[in-house]
UniProtKB/Swiss-Prot annotation:
Pfam families in alphabetical order: TMEM120A-B
Any one annotated GO CC term: nuclear inner membrane
Domain of life: Eukaryota
Function per UniProt: Necessary for efficient adipogenesis. Does not show ion channel activity.
Residue runs in coiled coils: 1-39
Protein name in UniProt: Transmembrane protein 120B-B
Gene from which the chain derives: tmem120b-b
Subcellular location: Nucleus inner membrane
Length: 335
């Protein structure tokens, strides 16, 4: 390339750089405008929420003294207030907010709000794929430890993988909740309890008690991975249909249990889920029995027994509540 051409190239680059500087200046201005709008929206929402709470309290005071027409008006306003709170939830999904205590401990005070619907859905989709791939890896790991590699070292690798998997799930779920995902209740707590359980399993030293429970735990892990794979396969298809019909949010997640939206098309999974819940109870009873063994000296045995019992109670009662609520609704619909 001649010197003249190099000079021409440099001239073009200078023009492009100046244009880039102008574009970047506009970009920074828009960011400042966006930040101001976000603060303004958050302020309006908080103010509106406070006023709605006060209004709801005042209306509640009139319920017992109002006539029939006034009661209907109060009920109508109550229903609108609930709808308004749902609208606020959707709005806040696109606004920066304070992280939960857990996210603050893990990530610090970092803004995890994803601003576009496409970015949110891409993150949710990546979360679902992560669950699927790790479920398959954990299934293969449990089968290998149960039938091929009978070593404590390989068991520790498997248990460490479980700890990492559940820790990562809790972080990703917390980010999704901050971005408008409606996963809540026991199915959030479930992964924290599972993280603790896997951590205790990892610290359990090799010995007679460990070997007496090892095969049962690995068999349970194989079963659990198979159930999770089935749930992902059928729940993702069901959610796709419900989202297409507008009956579910685009950030709705697959879960390890049973929820009301699964009633149509996924009830065949209920017996499998209940079997898994009672297997957790069986694990708890086995460990309680081992804790009374004369050679049992490890604290992990009793702690694991309590943790499995907690998982059973949480899973079983939550699933039972969903089934009971659905039956009650079906009874009310019947003439």
């Amino acid at each position: 390339m001649s010197l003249q051409k190099c000079q021409e190239e440099w001239g073009e680059l200078e023009k492009e750089f100046q244009q880039l500087q102008e574009t970047h200046k506009v970009y920074k201005q828009k960011l400042e405008e966006l930040s101001s709008l976000q603060n303004l929206c958050s302020s309006y929402i908080n103010k509106h929420k406070r006023r709605l709470t006060e209004l709801k309290g005042n209306l509640h005071g009139y319920k017992h003294t109002s006539n029939l027409e006034e009661k209907e008006l109060i009920q109508q306003i109550d229903g609108t207030i609930k709808e308004r709170h749902n609208a606020f939830f959707d709005m806040e999904a696109y606004l920066p907010k304070k992280n939960s205590l857990y996210l603050n401990l893990v990530l610090g005070n970092v803004n995890v709000t994803l601003l576009s619907k496409q970015t949110k859905f891409a993150y949710k989709d990546e979360y679902e794929k992560f669950k699927l791939y790790l479920t398959i890896i954990l299934l293969l790991g449990a089968i290998t430890c149960r039938f091929v590699l009978h070593y404590r070292v390989t068991d520790e690798v498997f248990n460490f993988l479980l700890v990492w998997y559940f820790c990562t799930l809790t972080i990703r779920e917390s980010i999704l909740i901050s971005n408008g995902s409606r996963i809540k209740g026991w199915w959030v707590s479930h992964h924290y309890v599972s993280t603790f359980l896997s951590g205790v399993m990892l610290t359990w030293p090799d010995g007679l008690m460990y070997q007496m429970f090892r095969n049962q735990f690995l068999a349970f892990s194989i079963f659990q991975s198979c159930v999770q794979f089935l749930q992902y396969y059928y729940q993702s298809g069901c959610l796709y249909r419900l989202r297409a019909l507008g009956e579910r949010n685009h950030l709705h997640l697959t879960v390890e249990g049973f929820q009301s939206w699964m009633w149509r098309g996924l009830t065949f999974l209920l017996p499998v889920l209940f079997f898994g819940h009672f297997w957790q109870l069986y694990n708890a009873m086995t460990l309680f029995g081992l804790s009374r063994h004369e050679e049992c000296k490890e604290w992990q045995v009793f702690v694991l027994a309590l943790t499995f019992l907690l998982l059973f109670l949480g899973n079983f009662l939550t699933t039972l509540k969903v089934v009971h609520t659905k039956f009650q609704k079906n009874k009310l619909k019947k003439p």
